[in-house]
């Protein structure tokens, strides 16, 4: 305590110095570094004391946030003559901040023995020793405090990624944080900010509600929700007779604005009737994804819970007239929506449930709430809607229920249940479920397992209704079978006959076929923006969360969506993840609406007739029966949440194969992107998604200005311990790129191109080695492209769509072999399972030469992403891997992707892929008692790797989606390019792929004998990759000030190869979630061009070693720099140079966003900790 008090006094003095205007930039920077060191010591020494003193808040605000805000304002000032220099400084500072929090998280986990799934053990990284030199002075904190500070780090890593326009990476961090402590509302508030920046209104409101309705609500969320609803009330009323999904969502939010703000309640009845009518019409057209329906339901439940907390029913409450009106209208809307969803479920078949179009998840959530609120059955709204119960009876009987279905309830959470952890309105209903396993605990494997589990839940709920409300439903059991019956006459529900274009969702749902939407759960956020997704008049609008939805080129997004439709039927789950169209939809919403109106007039008319007939048959009010309107939330409805890690996707928290992938996407473990310079030992498996960087523009609120987002953790931290074993999600784009159709041909051409690229890359590597800093500075501005790399890579990219698609599809074949040797030894990025099987073998032979050639140059993923609009998204990881492979011999994501994932990091030592040198160094590191960063870049990558390699398959990404996104992730996060991260296995083994059996390819990466890992927690939903794969443009780490442009593919360099490998992005130091989609970072870090200072990873990775080659071969085949000994030399040089030039670099312009700043920081710490262990830093 005395020691920490002393630290605190020193910190106060430093804070005062930093505010002294007389100090120069160098002095302020020095004070900031000292302040960071002091706060870090306090947090590690006495966490409880530090949290009580709000040290974690001061650390963020004074050491990072204030400086970030200042630099952002200067960079946004167009009149500033030094704007480019400021932008470079901002990029470098964000890189350093990301590195700091990544390191802090790693140290906290090591010191307090916290086992986060998103974290790789230090011994396996070869960077830090797991042993602590002095633990006597450390005060053991409460488990809840450990969980809280880890969540704090994850949240701010997400904030930093958001400032860097890496929205997918940011979402992954936020989701991991939410999973770590579900009862804390801050991560949900940050997710809402991300959704808002993407124009996904439904998702925005959903997460604000989630942030409020938890045990520890986030104070700013209530204000944010009020502002959002007030803005909705200011919008004009919809006068169209046929609404699009976007129109519906806007009206739905407006309805809740009236209720929540108690304004103009006289409009509620008319608006409710219109909503019911349009919901009925839209849902019959399958305009909503499962996830959108769940979000709509949860928002209703939030408001109902807000109006009346029926958990305290024993207490007598007196409600005002306004509260009574709001309650009656909202409960009527809720029950009408439930009835409409039941009628839709009757028309659905198993396919719809698998694909994510089915309303059963939302129905299950609705019945959960009714079971907790039995007094609601006495309300008049229930009596008026008794026609819904015969439909429930028919649905339950269609499951052919058995007695064991009622008695043997599973404790494994469904995707919709996993997403609602901590939600107060449903908390009692979820208590019996086992969330301890995180995303991996979600039902995965065969589609039938998840579907059967949901059916069991529904049967149990039906049995409860029969036992407690016999007037509505009765239940009979005979011969082990359960039969549900009812005395209420059933109204016939008919499939709409209209062929008109269904109302398009805001996102790209309209563009997607219903099948596609069902397949993948995608982020509504990105999808909502793509309003221009073009639905053919003949196609039904499918509400899907498009994970790959990007606010970039609409045409590309549309093409991706169309391709996804074609392939989506095959990979419906993955396609749904594409949310790119959603964003475009918003842009083209006017056009779409007009077209939709034309197309949907017929359907609407038919639907209206059907509704009328149904209502006539029913004795209940016709208006209510048919009033269940389905409006499109701009982004939410039309597109499912796209994993933030995916280029355009904002994934919903949980998603599982059983749950229609489009509806739920569980983010894969957060990918801790590290400086690409860090090379992982062959045995170390690092998920590519962790290395991916989201390039999504930070949109309106990249930075939350309100302090509420940074409420003292001491106040926020939950009283109870939180499971720490959940890995960060690894959202990956699930949309299959359209250009993949000629994947094989492309693969062949890519192989040739790769060979050429290898040569070019070798040249580039030499160039890079000569001038590492130049490239890094270039990357910071607009990553310069290595010409040789560009040429070789461009040759493949000449058909950017083809080559990238090929690589994405065949990264396993072409790039994988090249990349495999280097990456496998260090890190194996995941790649499309399909790709892995198709190309791993053919590519391996080329890998050695390719690795050497491609080692340093990194090809940007942006072009790649954009060219195959969603191919990249879907195949992001493989694509990234491909890029990495092409770009960097050392960073061959695709090769490694092709190869099966190696053993978990824990097994790295035993992995045959590990070079003997690395094994030896690892052993030495373990012997060390002090934390030792062998290589700053390596450390970050290691961190990134841990997230990616979180045990388990990617639960959030469909196999293809994961694979695709995995490539993107790898490519994007040049950090991991060398290491084919375990993304392959994740992709191949994604929970979604298993659950839905879609595009499921066994990790056929025979090239690298990597141990198969369990599906990552975040790959639960096949259709919704959660891995941190980012859109190509998103992956680019553009200056935060330029965030608005970074999201546009056009703003990014057109040639993916050039950006990726040409220069190092400013975010080279990006930690776990910072990998830039631009592989440039990886290139710079890994490329030999930085051999002197920043060639940490590539230089040491064997460029020529093939994945099939033993670890020794991979290590030794690579340029001598690939060996640890070789690395030692560069490390010494780099450390000397970095330390000597660190101050000058920072004070001057920080133009080198690459590893320079972060490396220097790490080097300083290294030197402090090494105590003569210089030899132990081989991978520097």
Swiss-Prot record:
GO terms, molecular function: telomerase RNA binding; telomeric DNA binding
InterPro entries: DNA/RNA-bd_Est1-type, Est1-like_N, Est1/Ebs1-like, TPR-like_helical_dom_sf
Ranges of Low complexity composition bias in the record: 741-778, 1039-1065
Feature: compositional bias, Pro residues: 728-740
Subcellular location as annotated: Cytoplasm; Nucleus
Stretches with biased composition (Polar residues): 504-520, 692-718, 1026-1038, 1103-1125
Keyword terms, alphabetized: Cytoplasm, Nonsense-mediated mRNA decay, Nucleus, Repeat, TPR repeat
Region annotation (Disordered) ranges: 496-636, 692-795, 893-913, 1019-1127, 1148-1180
GO cellular component, one term: cytoplasm
UniProt keyword Nucleus present: yes
GO aspect biological process, one term: chordate embryonic development
Domain of life of the organism encoding this protein: Eukaryota
Record field: compositional bias (Basic and acidic residues): 547-559, 584-606, 615-627, 1076-1090
TPR repeats: 151-184, 186-218
Annotated protein name in UniProt: Nonsense-mediated mRNA decay factor SMG7
Originating organism: Danio rerio (Zebrafish)
């Amino acid at each position: 305590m005395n020691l920490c008090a002393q630290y605190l006094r020193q910190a106060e003095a430093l804070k005062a110095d930093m505010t002294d205007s007389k100090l120069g930039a160098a002095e302020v920077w020095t004070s900031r570094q000292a302040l960071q060191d002091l706060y870090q010591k306090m947090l590690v020494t006495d966490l409880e004391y530090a949290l009580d003193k709000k040290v974690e808040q001061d650390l963020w605000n004074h050491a990072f946030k204030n400086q970030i805000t200042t630099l952002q304002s200067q960079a946004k000032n167009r009149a500033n003559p030094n704007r480019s220099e400021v932008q470079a400084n901002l990029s470098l500072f964000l890189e350093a901040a990301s590195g700091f929090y990544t390191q802090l998280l790693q140290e906290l986990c090591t010191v307090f023995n916290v086992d986060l799934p998103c974290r790789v053990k230090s011994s396996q990284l070869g960077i830090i020793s797991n042993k602590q030199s002095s633990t006597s002075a450390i005060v053991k904190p409460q488990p809840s405090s450990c969980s809280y500070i880890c969540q704090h780090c994850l949240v701010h890593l997400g904030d930093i990624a958001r400032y860097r326009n890496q929205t997918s990476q940011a979402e992954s961090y936020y989701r991991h944080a939410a999973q770590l402590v579900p009862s804390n509302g801050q991560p949900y508030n940050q997710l809402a900010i991300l959704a808002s920046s993407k124009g996904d209104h439904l998702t925005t409101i959903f997460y604000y509600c989630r942030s409020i309705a938890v045990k520890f609500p986030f104070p700013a969320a209530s204000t944010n929700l009020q502002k959002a609803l007030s803005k909705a009330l200011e919008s004009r009323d919809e006068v169209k007779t046929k609404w699009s999904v976007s129109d519906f969502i806007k009206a739905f939010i407006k309805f809740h604005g009236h209720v929540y703000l108690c304004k103009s309640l006289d409009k509620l009845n008319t608006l409710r009737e219109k909503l019911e009518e349009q919901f009925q019409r839209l849902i019959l057209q399958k305009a909503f994804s499962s996830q959108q329906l769940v979000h709509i339901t949860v928002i209703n439940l939030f408001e109902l819970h807000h109006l009346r907390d029926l958990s305290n029913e024993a207490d007598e409450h007196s409600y005002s007239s306004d509260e009574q009106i709001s309650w009656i209208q909202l409960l009527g809307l809720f029950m009408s929506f439930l009835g409409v969803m039941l009628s839709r479920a009757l028309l659905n078949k198993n396919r719809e449930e698998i694909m994510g179009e089915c309303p059963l998840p939302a129905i299950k959530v609705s019945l959960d709430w009714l079971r907790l609120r039995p007094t609601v059955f006495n309300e008049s709204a229930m009596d008026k809607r008794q026609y819904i119960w015969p439909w429930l009876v028919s649905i339950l009987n269609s499951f052919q229920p058995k007695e064991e279905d009622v008695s043997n309830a599973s404790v494994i959470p469904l995707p919709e249940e996993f997403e609602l952890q901590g939600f107060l309105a449903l908390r009692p209903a979820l208590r019996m479920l086992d969330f301890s396993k995180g995303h991996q605990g979600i039902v995965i494997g065969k589609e039938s397992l998840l579907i059967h589990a949901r059916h069991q839940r529904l049967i149990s709920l039906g049995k409860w209704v029969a036992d407690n409300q016999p007037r509505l439903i009765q239940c009979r059991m005979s011969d082990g079978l359960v039969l549900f019956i009812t005395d209420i006459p059933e109204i016939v529900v008919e499939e709409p006959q209209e062929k008109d274009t269904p109302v398009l969702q805001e996102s790209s749902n309209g563009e997607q076929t219903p099948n596609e939407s069902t397949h993948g759960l995608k982020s509504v956020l990105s999808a909502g923006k793509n309003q221009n997704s073009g639905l053919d008049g003949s196609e039904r609008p499918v509400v899907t969360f498009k994970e790959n939805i990007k606010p970039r080129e609409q045409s590309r997004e549309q093409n991706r969506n169309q391709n996804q439709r074609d392939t989506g039927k095959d990979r419906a789950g993955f396609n749904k993840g594409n949310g790119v169209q959603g964003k475009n939809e918003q842009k083209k919403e006017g056009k779409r609406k007009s077209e939709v109106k034309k197309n949907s007039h017929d359907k609407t008319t038919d639907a209206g007739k059907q509704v009328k007939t149904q209502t006539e048959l029913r004795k209940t009010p016709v208006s209510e029966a048919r009033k269940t309107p389905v409006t499109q939330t701009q982004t939410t409805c039309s597109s499912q949440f796209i994993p933030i890690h995916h280029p355009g996707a904002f994934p919903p928290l949980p998603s599982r194969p059983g749950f229609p992938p489009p509806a739920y996407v569980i983010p894969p473990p957060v990918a801790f992107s590290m400086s690409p310079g860090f090379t992982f030992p062959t045995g170390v498996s690092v998920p590519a998604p962790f290395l991916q960087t989201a390039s999504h523009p930070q949109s309106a609120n990249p930075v939350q200005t309100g302090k509420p987002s940074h409420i003292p953790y001491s106040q926020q931290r939950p009283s109870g311990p939180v499971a720490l074993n959940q890995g960060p999600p690894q959202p990956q784009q699930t949309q299959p790129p359209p250009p993949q159709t000629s994947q094989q041909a492309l693969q062949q051409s890519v192989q040739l191109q790769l060979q050429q690229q290898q040569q070019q890359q070798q040249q580039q590597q030499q160039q890079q080695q000569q001038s590492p800093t130049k490239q890094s500075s270039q990357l910071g501005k607009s990553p310069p492209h290595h010409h040789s790399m560009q040429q070789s890579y461009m040759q493949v990219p000449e058909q950017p769509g083809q080559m990238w698609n090929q690589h994405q599809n065949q990264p396993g074949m072409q790039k994988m072999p090249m990349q495999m040797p280097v990456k496998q030894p260090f890190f194996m990025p995941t790649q499309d399972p399909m790709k892995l099987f198709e190309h791993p073998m053919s590519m391996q032979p080329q890998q050695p030469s390719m690795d050497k050639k491609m080692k340093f140059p990194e090809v940007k993923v942006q072009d790649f992403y954009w060219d195959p609009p969603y191919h990249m998204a879907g195949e992001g990881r493989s694509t990234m891997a491909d890029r990495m492979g092409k770009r960097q011999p050392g960073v061959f994501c695709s090769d490694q992707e092709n190869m099966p994932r190696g053993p978990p990091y824990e097994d790295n030592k035993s992995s045959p892929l590990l070079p003997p040198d690395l094994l030896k160094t690892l052993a030495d590191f373990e012997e060390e008692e002090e934390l030792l960063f062998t290589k700053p870049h390596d450390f970050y990558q290691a961190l990134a790797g841990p997230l990616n390699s979180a045990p388990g398959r990617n639960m959030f990404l469909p196999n293809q989606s994961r694979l695709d996104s995995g490539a993107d992730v790898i490519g994007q996060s040049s950090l991991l390019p060398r290491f084919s991260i375990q993304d392959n296995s994740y992709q191949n083994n994604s929970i979604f792929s298993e659950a839905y059996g879609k595009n499921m390819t066994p990790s056929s990466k025979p090239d690298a004998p990597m141990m198969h890992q369990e599906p990552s927690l975040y790959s639960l939903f096949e259709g919704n990759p959660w891995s941190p794969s980012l859109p190509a443009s998103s992956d680019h780490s553009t200056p935060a000030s330029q965030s608005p442009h970074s999201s546009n593919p056009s703003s990014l360099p057109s040639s993916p190869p050039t950006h990726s490998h040409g220069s190092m992005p400013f975010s080279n130091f990006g930690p776990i979630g910072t990998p830039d989609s631009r592989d440039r970072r990886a290139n710079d870090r890994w490329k030999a061009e930085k051999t002197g200072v920043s060639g940490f990873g590539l230089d040491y990775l064997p460029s020529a070693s093939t994945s099939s080659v033993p670890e020794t071969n991979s290590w030794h085949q690579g340029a001598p720099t690939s060996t640890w000994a070789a690395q030692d030399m560069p490390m010494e040089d780099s450390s000397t140079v970095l330390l000597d030039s660190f101050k000058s670099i920072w004070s001057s312009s920080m133009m080198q966003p690459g590893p320079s700043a972060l490396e220097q920081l790490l080097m300083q710490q290294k030197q402090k900790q090494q105590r003569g262990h210089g030899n132990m830093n081989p991978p520097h």
